[in-house]
Amino acid sequence: MSQAEFDKAAEEVKRLKTQPTDEEMLFIYSHFKQATVGDVNTDRPGLLDLKGKAKWDSWNKLKGTSKESAMKTYVEKVDELKKKYGI
């Protein structure tokens, strides 16, 4: 998986004709963060930040996943979403 393919997918996901589901967005977010930052490096958001907690939890589940693996899974998911929602 090349950085160029990953960067292209990151741009394409912003142009989907229909907004993906929350679950799909969490998947995309967590794999993007794992590919670009690595393991979660922040404290878990507070009790009242439901969206922040969901994003953090989704990313934290990928702890230990390699950058390459996260990039590959991210690109595959974006390709799936492009077929499902169109660009």
From Swiss-Prot:
It holds the Pfam family ACBP. It comes from the Eukaryota. The modification N6-succinyllysine is found at residues 8, 17, 55, 61, 77. InterPro entries: Acyl-CoA-binding_prot_CS, Acyl-CoA-binding_protein, Acyl-CoA-binding_sf, FERM/acyl-CoA-bd_prot_sf. The modification N6-acetyllysine is found at residues 8, 51, 55, 77. Keywords: Acetylation, Endoplasmic reticulum, Golgi apparatus, Hydroxylation, Lipid-binding, Phosphoprotein, Transport. The modification N6-(2-hydroxyisobutyryl)lysine is found at residue 55. GO terms for cellular component: endoplasmic reticulum; extracellular space; Golgi apparatus; mitochondrion; synaptic vesicle. An acyl-CoA binds at residues 14, 29-33, 51, 55, 74. Binds medium- and long-chain acyl-CoA esters with very high affinity and may function as an intracellular carrier of acyl-CoA esters. It is also able to displace diazepam from the benzodiazepine (BZD) recognition site located on the GABA type A receptor. It is therefore possible that this protein also acts as a neuropeptide to modulate the action of the GABA receptor. This is Acyl-CoA-binding protein. It comes from Mus musculus.
